[in-house]
A protein has these predicted regions:
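Extended low-complexity, intrinsically disordered and solenoidal helical-scaffold regions
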Residues: 2-216
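Core RecA-like ATPase module of SF1/SF2 helicases and allied nucleic-acid translocases
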Residues: 527, 566-569, 639, 651-654, ...
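ASCE P-loop NTPase helicase motor core
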Residues: 510-676
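Conserved, well-folded catalytic cores of nucleic-acid-processing
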Residues: 473-480, 539, 561-564, 606, ...
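N-terminal accessory nucleic-acid engagement/regulatory domains that precede
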Residues: 127-135, 140, 145, 149-482
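Conserved adenine-nucleotide phosphate-binding loops and their immediately adjacent elements
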Residues: 484-497
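Pre-Walker A adenine-sensing motif
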Residues: 497-515
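Conserved RecA-like ASCE P-loop NTPase motor core of nucleic-acid helicases/translocases
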Residues: 519-562, 615, 671-715, 719, ...
Length: 903
């Protein structure tokens, strides 16, 4: 046996022993296996390289087996080994980006399992070499129910399907491999390739095909069913696919490089490039980074049958900038890695001007920060995922960016303003890295994006400035109240014209502006925060009032709950977008925990108000971007400005109220209480049985057996009405729907508006929906909107809308949203979508796939959506893991540091 085989088998033996001994501890096992993988891949690459020199490796000198660089170079030049190249790159990038804790190792090992199976299969086929013989014992899937589900799908995948390739194009949003009997299959999440499609319009399909996810694709899709829990669940099978970048995306990319072209999908150059990308599994950036000889070969192949070259004229220009590392190269790297029409349009200068600092590309100057420091800056209107960046941009010499990114994410994602030096153990010379980062910033950005420190705690300067400015402004307006305020409220109440039947709310109203001109009202879910807003609005009935909230559903809720005159209601985004300065006597902001620091400082700078009411719950889902001001205000603003509502009104169910309190306080006996009161249930068919007409199923994820898509398919199959297909989605009369964000029907149909399909008519190029919506409108409301009012009752209205399909729709840059269905089927919805809504019955599904994503705020928000019945579907193991991991972030370190800094 040659030395190379000895080395490979020695590594394999080590992996085998680890799996054999440590199956019950996936984190520890993953850590040990990951330590072996780089060496494993590199020696496999050498074996293939040496074999390519001579089919018989027995006569090859031993020193050849040490040529790791030659081995890696060989596999990079052969499309068969693209998976091996990708695996090696991932191992390298993971080592530089992750601390190899057991938890991180476990995540990575699950991601890499697919590649290990490919190695096993290739070495057996090519050399009859048996490796990874017990890899099937690695505990990939810890849920037996999921295994049964996927086995039934695999039975369908193994059948031969013949279906036509779609004319429609799709973007692949997520590819999740799953494994049955050492074979690899994929669960694909995809959506229409349309600039206006909502991120919530996701479809799930299954395939044996390893589909490239960088670009738009065409799919051959077949409808089928599998039997789950005695019910036939509709599924989609992808039997074939092809790369099909939208021609308008190539046109836009070319414009950025000052090459005006008009590509058609019928062009030979286009067709051969799409075919080559699929066959070689090289994305456009991979092609651009090939050595000159290989690049010219690809170019010659793709353009062989073309009378005129269009695409490669653009790619030649692009390659020259990227290979020579000229300014603009990182923007081009990312855009060529992910051709996406919407993203590219956002980068262009609105007047079509050149950016001199980025090699005269036709992009806006706002692209410069990303080009210079891509790991800690965003493109215009787009925040790239870290793994996409790691794939297309080298990290060498960018450690300062990775450190800054970690500090930034700790604030934006974890809500921590200050990050301790102890959290940066994987970085060396932190002080020097921060100096480098700060000096590389554009001088005008150093005060906002720069990193500062308080002792051994680091922070983003702009984040700290925002929260300090907010708190100082609130402290300033809390110094004095309204003279004779309490007496005036007492007098108003004594007239009997307005009744407040809650003693606590009456006392708050009497004192809220006695000593302060700002009132912060905190309250748990269902304690009547909206009612309190209504009381205050009615007392100030003659004064001009502006009521703001972050979302359309929250604004709509205020409109329903507030009956006072002289009120104007707006979303925060709409208010800030308006250029006119708006004055008011009373400014009220609802759901303050969802308002980011940056938005709040803008509101305080723009608004001209005399009194301010801030309302929210710090235990519900927080701001998407960094927003900790409302939590910190509770300990930094005068106590005379702080009020708390404690008595719940959403429900009178004592066990349910006790549960809310226990989750809110994260009490020690939470698991026992959930069990004793039958709130915890194992996942079974009962989740699909409707217990109440006003019922919702809440999930955190869209894919998987118990994801939103599958639950909707299950429950829709119970609907006896005829199914009407539009694209890959089925609709039925009687389906509940939830509207997405759409400018086409705004403000009548808004994000999160609930409705029900009352009629469907399908034509060749048009589908017409009649939707009953839970709001009453009149004919004047829909003037100038593409809506028809069919009927209206005391509590609802039925509106008619049309969605169209045009030939070669995705070829062109179609800005129209009349091709997009503006709602999603909503038997089940996401927990985030449910915020601000309430139901008689809530069923919450938490699987082991998403247990790490369940935070204290997410769990609390989910369980407080119900007024009567609650069931949480999870395994005992998942329940234990979630309860043990959720924590209440008290932000004590942030509070302590800020107290010292505030005036």
């Amino acid at each position: 046996m040659k030395k190379i085989d000895v080395v490979i088998l020695d590594i394999d033996k080590n992996i085998y022993k680890n799996i054999d001994k440590s199956q019950d501890d996936r984190g520890y096992l993953s850590q040990n296996i990951l330590a072996q993988l780089r060496n494993f891949i590199e020696h496999i690459s050498i074996k293939y390289y040496v074999h390519s020199i001579s089919g018989d490796i027995s006569g090859i000198p031993e020193e050849k087996f040490n040529e790791i660089n030659q081995g890696l170079k060989f596999i990079k030049g052969n499309s068969k080994f693209h998976f091996l190249v990708k695996f090696h790159q991932m191992i390298q990038k993971s080592a530089s980006h992750y601390t190899m804790s057991e938890e991180n190792s476990e995540r990575l090992m699950l991601k890499y399992y697919e590649y290990l199976l490919k190695i096993k299969k290739n070495l057996k086929t090519d050399f009859d070499l048996d490796v990874l013989t017990n890899i099937d014992k690695f505990p990939v899937n810890l849920d037996n129910q999921l295994s049964d589900y996927y086995k039934k799908i695999v039975d369908k995948l193994e059948l031969t399907y013949v279906s036509e390739m779609s004319e429609d194009r799709y973007y692949i949003q997520k590819t999740k491999p799953f494994f049955i009997d050492n074979e690899i299959y994929y669960e694909i999440t995809f959506r229409e390739a349309n600039d206006k499609t909502s991120k919530f319009d996701r479809n799930i399909a299954f395939t044996k095909q390893d589909i490239l996810s960088n670009y738009a694709v065409k799919l051959s899709i077949k409808h089928d069913t599998v039997n789950i829990h005695g019910k036939y669940m509709p599924i989609l099978i992808i039997s074939d696919w092809e790369v099909s970048i939208r021609p308008c995306e190539i046109d836009f990319f070319s414009e950025i490089l000052n090459n005006s072209i008009k590509i058609q999908s019928s062009h030979n150059e286009y067709k051969r490039l799409m075919s080559f990308i699929k066959k070689s599994k090289l994305n456009v950036l991979d092609i651009l980074l090939l050595d000159i000889s290989s690049y010219e070969k690809v170019k010659a192949y793709v353009t062989a049958k073309s009378q005129k070259i269009y695409i490669f004229k653009t790619l030649d220009k692009c390659r020259e900038i990227i290979i020579n590392n000229r300014p603009g190269c990182n923007v081009l790297r990312y855009l060529s890695y992910h051709f996406n029409n919407k993203i590219m349009k956002l980068q262009k200068d609105r007047y079509g001007n050149y950016c001199e600092r980025l090699s005269n590309l036709r992009v806006a100057y706002g692209c410069i920060p990303f080009d210079e420091m891509p790991f800690v800056s965003s493109l215009i209107g787009h925040n790239p995922k870290i793994y996409d960046l790691l794939w297309c941009i080298e990290t060498n010499g960018r450690e300062h960016e990775l450190l800054a990114r970690k500090i930034q994410i700790n604030s934006q994602t974890n809500g921590k303003l200050y990050t301790s030096v102890d959290e940066h153990e994987s970085f060396e010379d932190i002080h020097l890295l921060i100096e480098k980062y700060n000096s590389n910033l554009y001088w005008k950005h150093r005060e906002t994006r720069g990193i500062g420190n308080v002792g051994k705690n680091y922070y983003i300067k702009g984040f700290e400035d925002d929260v300090i400015n907010i708190l100082e402004k609130l402290k300033e307006i809390s110094k004095e109240g309204i003279d004779n305020y309490a007496n005036s409220v007492e007098s108003w109440l004594n007239t009997g014209s307005y009744i407040i039947d809650c003693k606590d709310k009456k006392e708050i109203l009497k004192t809220m502006f006695s000593n302060s001109k700002v009132s912060l009202i905190y309250g748990a879910a269902g304690t009547g925060k909206s009612t309190m807003i209504n009381h205050a609005s009615n007392f100030f009935g003659l004064q001009k009032k502006l009521l703001l909230a972050n979302t359309n559903p929250a604004v709509d809720n205020l409109k329903r709950k507030v009956s006072a005159p002289n009120c104007e209601f707006k979303t925060i985004a709409k208010y800030l977008y308006s250029k006119e300065k708006q004055d008011c006597d009373l400014l009220i902001i609802d759901e303050c925990s969802t308002v980011s620091n940056s938005d709040m400082i803008k509101i305080l700078s723009k608004a001209d108000f005399k009194l301010l009411i801030l309302v929210g719950d710090i235990y519900q889902i927080e701001s998407i971007t960094f927003g900790n001001w409302f939590k910190l205000a509770k300990t930094n603003v005068s106590r005379t400005s702080l009020f708390e509502l404690t008595e719940p009104y959403r429900t009178k169910d004592k066990p349910l109220l006790n549960l809310w309190t226990k989750v809110r306080k994260n009490e020690d006996d939470l698991i026992e209480y959930l069990t004793a009161n039958n709130y915890s249930v194992r996942l079974d068919e009962s989740v699909f049985l409707t217990d109440d007409l006003d019922e919702i199923i809440l999930c955190l994820n869209y894919d998987g057996l118990y994801g939103i898509n599958n639950i909707n398919c299950f429950l829709q199959s119970n609907n006896p009405n005829k199914s009407v297909n539009w694209g890959v989605v089925s609709y039925k009369i009687g389906d509940p729907v939830l509207f997405n964000e759409t400018s086409r029907f705004s403000p009548v149909l808004f994000n999160n508006l609930k409705g029900k399909i009352s009629n469907i008519e399908k034509l060749d190029t048009e589908i017409i929906f009649d939707i009953e919506i839970e709001t009453v409108i009149n004919e004047m409301d829909i003037v100038d909107l593409d809506l028809e009012l069919i009927s209206s009752t005391k509590n609802s209205s039925i509106v008619r809308l049309s969605v169209y399909k045009y030939p070669n729709m995705s070829d062109n840059d179609n800005d129209s949203d009349d091709t997009v269905v503006p709602f999603q089927i909503a038997y089940a919805i996401s927990i985030h979508k449910a915020q601000g809504l309430e139901f008689n019955s809530v069923k919450l599904i938490i699987t082991d796939e998403i247990d790490e994503l369940i935070t204290h705020n997410i769990l609390y928000t989910a369980i407080t959506r119900t007024k009567k019945n609650l069931k949480i579907y999870w395994t005992p193991e998942t329940e234990k893991k979630v309860i043990e991991h959720i924590r209440i972030d008290e932000s004590r370190k942030d509070e302590s540091i800020l107290k010292r800094k505030l005036k």
